[in-house]
A protein has these predicted regions:
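Bacterial N-terminal signal peptides that target proteins for export
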Residues: 1-9
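Sec/Tat signal peptide C-region and signal peptidase I cleavage site
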Residues: 18-22
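N-terminal propeptides/low-complexity segments immediately following signal peptides
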Residues: 23-61
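N-terminal, post-signal-peptide region of Sec/Tat-exported proteins
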Residues: 97-127
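Functional cores of ribonucleases/endoribonucleases
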Residues: 129-145
Length: 306
């Protein structure tokens, strides 16, 4: 197959007594001599006691979600609170020093019917690298994002590593609903400001409208995001283009621990608003804090697979 377009798969990715104090023993005072015992009256017959009612078990206490501490929105005018929630959400999704995930990507719609790709994604901070291992014609293809303006790709049809231009970053990759720009959207609060609090409790979610910050080069001037109130994790995104028309949606499902000790969304679906074409990412495994070499985010890393 020939590759004409470049994009990225966003996997994913996210969002758990004090010792007893010894008492000092004080010696007891000597007891006073006992007074002579008074005659004891005969005991009255014992009154039968009704049997004790069985104890009603108490409901287990529900622990407050750790993730929600320190960030909340008081009312629809609380933009500062919403901004704090968005920043905490970013933190909850990026809880690692570095991360490696294995993902299967499935395309459906138009000419695609259950077309499947498999790849590994490596992330550290704002850097991200991807390497495909299946199907065979995609094996060795890779993408390295060192920053929003420095992206390199290795294309199987050319066997060369090339720097990706701005126009190419906005295009689809091999028919998927992801783009290279999507790959760089890791910390939302860095790129977007909260423009409006749409809802404080939409089925257990905060709903915010986000506006692209000045000077940020992304093709989505507006986003609508939903963040769970209990765990402060983002599980729904709407992307709007320059005409403020809905471009696509992203939904995240199946939050669970798959090996790192943290919960991540293991199924992510992106849907094109116009064509209804879908791309489903299934995260198969996750490893964190492996301290893999910084070389993972360089052109040399891509060249090694040639």
């Amino acid at each position: 197959m020939k590759l004409n377009r470049i994009s990225y798969v966003l996997a994913g990715a996210l969002l758990l007594g004090a010792p007893a104090v010894a008492q000092e023993t004080v010696p007891a005072a000597p007891a006073a001599p006992a007074a002579p015992a008074a005659p004891v009256a005969p005991e009255a017959p014992a009154v039968p006691v009704a049997p004790e009612a069985p104890a009603v078990p108490s409901a287990p206490a529900k622990a407050a979600p750790v993730a929600a501490k320190g960030a909340a929105v008081k009312d629809v005018n609380d933009i500062a609170g919403a901004t704090a929630v968005l920043a905490k959400c970013d933190q909850n999704h990026n809880y690692f020093q570095d991360q490696q995930i294995k993902t299967d990507m499935v395309l459906n719609g138009g000419v695609h019917k259950n077309v499947k790709y498999s790849f590994d994604t490596y992330t550290r901070g704002s850097k991200r690298s991807v390497r495909f291992d299946d199907p065979p014609e995609m094996r060795g293809m890779g993408v390295v994002t060192k920053g929003r303006d420095e992206v390199y790709a290795r294309l199987p049809d050319s066997n060369k590593v090339r720097r990706v231009g701005t126009h190419a970053k906005r295009q689809s990759f091999y028919g998927s609903d992801w783009s290279m720009d999507d790959m760089s959207m890791i910390y939302f609060e860095q790129d977007y400001a909260v423009a409006k609090v749409i809802s404080l409790d939409d089925n257990g979610h905060y709903t915010f409208e986000l506006k692209l910050k000045n000077g940020v080069d992304l093709p989505y001037p507006k986003l609508i995001v939903k963040i769970t109130r209990d765990t402060l994790l983002m599980d729904y995104i709407e992307y709007y283009d320059d005409t403020l028309s809905l471009k696509k949606t992203q939904e995240r499902f199946d939050l669970k621990d798959i090996g790192s000790g943290h919960q991540v969304y293991t199924h992510v679906r992106v849907t094109d608003a116009a064509t209804k074409h879908t791309t489903d990412n299934y995260v198969k495994s996750e490893k964190i804090n492996q301290n893999f070499p910084e070389d993972t985010f360089t052109k040399r890393w891509l060249v090694r697979s040639l």
